[in-house]
Amino acid sequence: MKIPQRYLQNRTSNIMQEYATINKSILDKLNPSNLYRFFCLSLYRNDYYKVRWRIKDLARHTGESKDALKNFNKDMEAVLVRKRYSEPINHPVYKFTMRSLYCIPPIEQPNFITISHLFMKVNLSVKVKGYYIKLLLIADNNKIILSSKKLADKLGMGKKNIESYNLDLYNAGLLRFLSNGFELTPKDLLLSNDIAKQRKEWNPTNSKNVVKLVFKSK
């Protein structure tokens, strides 16, 4: 049986939210590139913080090749749960393929930040964007009073990379240097945590979440 393409397309998450939240606890669990990829993934969560995406969907939104994401699912095991499910496909031999359902972790009050979807439009590399998210996670009042060496030690990164990324952020208008560190200038990219909504929990006793079955006696 041929399955309508419209039905197959609806099996992926294609509605982008206005923002994504990032818990401070994941700071040391993901490298900069994966942290930005996690942000992009989170933007397409539903009310239950679930995302149905293929690797090629993620690659399309981050502007990367699929090869660059070959270890993505394994790396994400440090911060989220990935469930596998079968999906029907139009294929002469195989009736279905396996897809991923990503379960985004709930908000950890009060230790999180809220980032606007507009961050995706910033013209910087995936690594630099992920590095900026790390800076937002550790900043105090948007300020980081650390030398490049101390910051590199804190984030587990190379000092030269830190200095290079800082220059990219400065040129993009997202950072300004101070005499003893620097200040982040995210403007409308960093939102108030007050707007963030916690994920909904699946409640099988809620009639809206249950498919009602009626059995008729013969």
Language model features with spans:
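Electropositive, intrinsically flexible nucleic-acid-contacting patches
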Residues: M1-K218
